UniProtKB/Swiss-Prot annotation:
Protein name per UniProt: Variable large protein 4
Organism of derivation: Borrelia hermsii
Entry keyword annotation includes Glycosyltransferase: no
Role of this protein: The Vlp and Vsp proteins are antigenically distinct proteins, only one vlp or vsp gene is transcriptionally active at any one time. Switching between these genes is a mechanism of host immune response evasion.
Location relative to the cell: Cell outer membrane
One Pfam family here: Lipoprotein_2
Gene symbol of the encoding locus: vlp4
Lipid-linked residues (N-palmitoyl cysteine): C19
SUPFAM superfamilies: Variable surface antigen VlsE
Length: 350
């Protein structure tokens, strides 16, 4: 990412050199290109922060707090807002270059605004000082995630995915076999806690490992925005990832609905329950089982967030390239009305 941004900045400076090589006094076009080049240097500082975000996503651990996930989304929102402001400030001062303004406006509306809005909404769902594992040696039964928190995560992630991933990934991805029927033990109540043993938890880990982060994200965004929780049948009636996340702890262990018996959906449900307020998992009262649950939860969240931030980086990188191409077009069209008579173009743009 740093090398790509550096290349963009170098191109901008080459444009400046070619503009000034004739010894002509600064005109609005030269001033504009100079300001964009300076903005490019600012990009290098702003977008390098994405590297820290990626490190944070890959560094998800069982003892990561839910509020840390919320901060992660808040940081994404702040970064997008900062970039938007810098771009719009420059466009406001140099509005006579219509082609560049159109590209920047589209980038802001289609990418930056959507990512920022989605991140802001998702952050509402990841709150509290509980750790994402929330399964301890002393904690035997599960607890459903707060419904409103899950809804915020689903809505927010959907907005981001629509901007950066589109239809990449498969919400119905599934590779494991009948073992999936035992994964419901993660959501059991105290009466059935002995079924939440390492052998069954390993089946959940297998589901998570068999799908991609994009598959998990697609399963999340295809969840209902108003999920239902069956207090009698529990996991047996869960139909999607959001409903798995909020399933009440009852003495039911088998995932029966065909729409939920998908590895991507199961992994997405575990990720949502781990990130959302109050969500907890069951484990047999032994250290090896507790560690297995913690590892599965961390894996699901880490894979989800890592894929999301990489997609954000790639999309923003692509947007910057498009802006750079627009700048190159302005240079090549010096004979256009806006370039051959900068003073008139500036006046007409005011």
């Amino acid at each position: 990412m740093r090398r790509r941004i550096s290349a963009i900045i170098m191109t901008l400076f080459m444009v400046l050199v070619s503009c000034n090589s004739g010894g002509v006094a600064e005109d609005p076009k030269t001033v504009y290109l100079t300001s964009i080049a300076n903005l490019g240097k600012g990009f290098l500082d702003v977008f390098v922060t994405f590297g820290d975000m990626v490190a944070g996503a890959f560094g998800i651990r069982a003892d990561t707090k839910k509020s840390d996930i919320g901060k992660y989304f808040n940081d994404i929102e702040k970064t997008m807002t900062t970039v938007k402001k810098r771009l719009q400030d420059e466009v406001a001062k140099n509005g006579n270059y219509v082609k560049v303004k159109e590209v920047v406006d589209k980038f802001v509306a289609d990418v930056l605004d959507k990512i920022a809005a989605g991140a802001k909404e998702a952050a509402k769902g990841a709150t509290g000082d509980d750790k994402i594992r929330k399964c301890y040696f002393c904690w035997a039964w599960s607890q459903s995630a707060d419904k409103d928190s899950v809804i915020s995560l689903v809505k927010g992630i959907k907005t981001i995915v629509d901007a950066v991933l589109k239809d990449k990934g498969d919400a119905g991805a599934t590779k494991t076999g009948e073992d999936k029927k035992d994964i419901g033990n993660l959501f059991i109540n105290d009466a059935g806690k002995d079924g939440s043993k390492r052998e069954n938890i390993a089946k959940a880990a297998a589901s998570i490992g068999s799908v991609t982060g994009a598959d998990i994200l697609q399963a999340i965004i295809k969840s209902k925005e108003n999920p239902n929780a069956d207090s009698v049948n529990g996991i047996e009636k869960a139909t999607d990832a959001a409903e798995i996340a909020i399933v009440p702890a009852v003495n039911k262990t088998e995932i029966k609905e065909d729409t939920a018996k998908k590895d991507a959906v199961i992994a997405a449900g575990i990720a949502l329950r781990a990130m959302a307020k109050d969500g907890k998992f069951a484990a047999k009262n032994e250290e090896k089982s507790a560690n297995a649950v913690n590892g599965a939860a961390a894996s699901a969240v880490g894979k989800t967030l890592s894929t999301l931030i990489i997609a954000i980086r790639n999309t923003v990188d692509s947007g910057l390239k498009t802006i750079n191409e627009a700048l190159a077009t302005v240079k090549q069209e010096d004979k256009s009305a806006e370039a051959t008579n900068p003073a008139e173009a500036t006046t007409s743009g005011q």
